[in-house]
Amino acid sequence: MSKSLQAIRGMNDILPEQTPLWRHFEGTVSRLLDNYGYRQIRMPVVEFTDLFKRSIGEVTDIVEKEMYTFADRNGDSLTLRPEGTAACVRAVLEHGITGGGQVQKLWYIGPMFRHERPQKGRYRQFHQIGVEVFNLDGPDIDAELIVMTWRLWGMLGIRNAVKLELNSLGTSEARARYRDALVEFLSAHLDQLDEDSQRRLKTNPLRVLDTKHPETQAVLVDAPKLADYLDDESRIHFEGLKARLDAAGIPYVINPKLVRGLDYYSKTVFEWVTDQLGAQGTVCAGGRYDGLVEQMGGKPTAGVGFAMGIERLVLLLETLEQVPEEIARQVDVYLCAFGEAAELAALALTEQVRDRLPNLRLQVNAGAGSFKSQFKKADKSGALYALILGEEELAAKIIGVKPLRGQGEQQNIAWDALSEHLASCVVQG
């Protein structure tokens, strides 16, 4: 096949066999967010490039190496969004919905784009669900976000496979003091740092902390600790968060090297990680960004949020075999009709059933075919039952209900009793 007729490397088709699990995951998350009082916002996938340079930071890996940036016909520099927070902040500023201290609890879903090396769990087009809260500056809202994700993991059956890591980055002033101390220490050990860490030391020193290079990790054992440079405000905030997580019974570990890859974070940062997906172990991450709105031209506004990677979480559900049986099965009932008169009757009959059982997944055979071929398609569909409507059934105004998964013998059911019968054996279990 011509390369131009193939998907771009790292940008994947999500095929019909995969979409039921995606819809299950997305539906579970959206219902949970609704229950917690969060409202959905939808932003464009393309923004002015300067938005991400100002928010994420010009010397971050995302801006320097990973963004899909192009000039449009007007000569404007545009970028496919690499993350959602900056675009959400731009939207709330543009429409003034956080003015006057209005609290906004928002969520969004959609594709993000980064030109990274594709591998399991990491793609160039990937999908995220993000949550952002504005004008709440206490540790209680930080805790709510974490408690909410903890509840989600329970709903999905993956709590035992994820671990919460926490850290506090302090205020910008505390972070600047720590940065100076870290640069001084690392500069004295420059020849022991890997090449990438030497580059980061000049551009974004805190990113050296999350290096995977063994020799650099050995140097960092004796490096200054961020916790020793925290201001009282940040320390009190962090203690308040931990107290709330303890009260909620949510286990966590303090990771002093957790800094996140975006410049706008302050105070709380957190990650949910798993050891089930290899190198790409972060499934959800976030933190506070109290200075970002002001940095982008707005008034000082507290902000906190997180994003979760849908591909990784779907992969985790599959790895742990946490795929509900009804999700794996896309059809509940498959109707086989034999003869033109039966096909006409089947159309009216199935629409009556749909009126009474709107959640029933009922598929009608299309394209005619012999009894054997239709029954084969019914079995292949994964349906629990086949409905059989032929000349004899048509004359008697009955329909055959044949179990396909070992639930007993075939029964003949009167047309006017079909909905009630299916409700008892399919919809209710």
From Swiss-Prot:
Principal place of residence: cytoplasm
EC number(s) reported in the record: 6.1.1.21
Keywords assigned: Aminoacyl-tRNA synthetase, ATP-binding, Cytoplasm, Ligase, Nucleotide-binding, Protein biosynthesis
Entries under PROSITE patterns matching the protein: AA_TRNA_LIGASE_II
One Gene Ontology cellular component annotation held by this UniProt entry: cytoplasm
Single biological process term from Gene Ontology: histidyl-tRNA aminoacylation
Molecular functions (GO terms): ATP binding; histidine-tRNA ligase activity
SUPFAM superfamilies: Class II aaRS ABD-related, Class II aaRS and biotin synthetases
Enzyme class, broadest EC rank: ligase
Catalytic reactions of this protein: tRNA(His) + L-histidine + ATP = L-histidyl-tRNA(His) + AMP + diphosphate + H(+)
Location of this chain's protein in the cell: Cytoplasm
Family: Belongs to the class-II aminoacyl-tRNA synthetase family.
Subunit structure: Homodimer.
Protein name: Histidine--tRNA ligase
Organism listed in the record: Pseudomonas syringae pv. tomato (strain ATCC BAA-871 / DC3000)
Gene that encodes it: hisS
